[in-house]
Swiss-Prot record:
InterPro entries the UniProt entry points to: Arrestin-like_C (IPR014752), Arrestin-like_N (IPR011021), Arrestin_C-like (IPR011022), Arrestin_domain-protein (IPR050357), Ig_E-set (IPR014756)
GO cellular component: cytoplasm
Record-annotated membrane-spanning stretches: none
Protein name (database record): Thioredoxin-interacting protein
Source lineage: Eukaryota, Metazoa, Chordata, Craniata, Vertebrata
Cross-link (Glycyl lysine isopeptide (Lys-Gly) (interchain with G-Cter in ubiquitin)), chain numbering: K212
């Protein structure tokens, strides 16, 4: 019977545990080993991997694909430590043994660390502890990588615009049209930036319509010639109702980019894309939707912030902006100061769901709840007779 010797601790520790690495940067750390009794160590090895993989079931068929970004192997040595026979290290209890390692990430484009429903981009370092007559022990530690996306390139700083018109009918009878045209100042944004929307809406149909805008994430997975697409609305803003025969305009209506992962556009099996949808809800008909592509970057320079602030200054100011106190005071309640058309919907709201918690139809189409007054307290004495007796 073989008795397995217990290892007290065996772990991978990075020199900078919170760091997010980029292409060409060095990943450094150490493998720490502690034993409970005298133990002979044959070798300590590491394997560093970076891989994108997708997996889902298409009926009875398994759709699976992988793409390697990184693979590095090395056998680690202790500095100034005596070795026993056959170049083995003799470890004793009470001591901490540290094996240092380091490697550089590839210079080419790397997939940003990501975890989705049907795929992920993952990076890790796995350490192996080899002992004679003992099973190999393993430990694993993940680290994050971000492929830098510079949003200050000429292509991403150029304005984006689109327009669309939809004819509306009722029981195959023409009922006018709804049109929308929109423009944003740039295509590339970073977390915390404001997207300033300039849009014009025209409603010549007999119905009351509602304009909205939303930031949408689209995850695309590709494997075995099959494609899987998931779309989710991250945040949104809405405007006022537009009655029949009227027009409306947005001049710098803003929508903030929340904390989201940068776009992943260079991976052949997994893509993370973002869009600004500007759409009009038409009761009893399909929505009129404009699709403006966005690129969410990982690097925001001064020009990005300056452009955003300049656009915001020229935009329409709401009453919220005009009521900022001169002296600091306790912050007011969010629901008290933010108008309904500026409130963000839940991040888990499905894309363009009609039941997103807001009433798209005109307010007079919803009958207010009428409450009757409660009946008076019952009494066997007629108040009229009582009044006549008093007189």
């Amino acid at each position: 019977m073989v008795m397995f010797k217990k290892i007290k601790s065996f772990e991978v520790v990075f020199n900078d545990p919170e760091k997010v690495y980029g292409c060409g940067e060095k990943v450094a750390g150490r493998v720490i080993v502690e034993v409970c009794e005298v133990t002979r160590i044959k070798a300590v090895r590491i394997l560093a991997c970076g891989v994108a993989k997708v997996l889902w079931m298409q009926g009875s068929q398994q759709c699976k694909q992988t793409l390697d970004y990184l693979r590095y192997e090395d056998t680690l040595l202790l500095d100034d430590h005596p070795t026993g026979e056959n170049e083995m290290v003799i470890m004793r209890p009470g001591n901490k043994y540290e094996y240092k390692f380091g490697f550089e990430l590839p210079q080419g484009p790397l997939g940003t660390s990501f975890k989705g429903k049907y795929g992920c981009v993952d990076y890790w370092v796995k350490a192996f502890l080899d002992r004679p007559s003992q099973p190999t022990q393993e430990t694993k530690k993940h680290f994050e990588v971000m492929d830098l996306v510079d949003v200050n390139t000429p292509d991403l700083m150029a304005p984006v615009s689109a327009k669309k018109e939809k004819k509306v009918s009722c029981m195959f009878i023409p009922d006018g049209r709804v049109s929308v045209s929109a423009r944003i100042d740039r295509k590339g944004f970073c977390e915390g930036d404001e997207i300033n929307i300039h849009a014009d809406f025209e409603n010549t149909c007999s119905r009351i319509v509602v304009p909205k805008a939303a930031i949408v994430a689209r995850h695309t997975y590709l494997a075995n010639g099959q494609t899987k697409v998931l779309t989710q609305k991250l945040s949104s803003v809405r405007g006022n109702h537009i009655i029949s025969g009227t027009c409306a305009s947005w001049r710098g209506k803003s929508l903030r980019v929340q904390k989201i992962r940068p776009s992943i556009l260079g991976c052949n099996i997994l893509r993370v894309e973002y869009f600004l949808l500007i759409y009009v809800s038409v009761p009893g008909s399909k929505k009129v939707i404009l699709d403006l592509p966005l690129v969410i970057g990982s690097r925001s320079g001064l020009s990005s912030r300056t452009s955003s602030m300049a656009s915001r200054t020229s935009s329409e100011m709401s009453w919220v902006d005009l009521n900022i106190p001169d002296t600091p005071e306790a912050p007011p309640c969010y629901m008290d100061i933010i108008p309904e058309d500026h409130r963000l919907e839940s991040p888990t709201t499905p894309l363009l769901d009609d039941t997103d918690g807001s009433q798209d139809s005109p307010i007079f189409m919803y009958a207010p709840e009428f409450k009757f007054m409660p009946p008076p307290t019952y009494s066997e004495v007629d108040p009229c007779i009582l009044n006549n007796n008093v007189q």
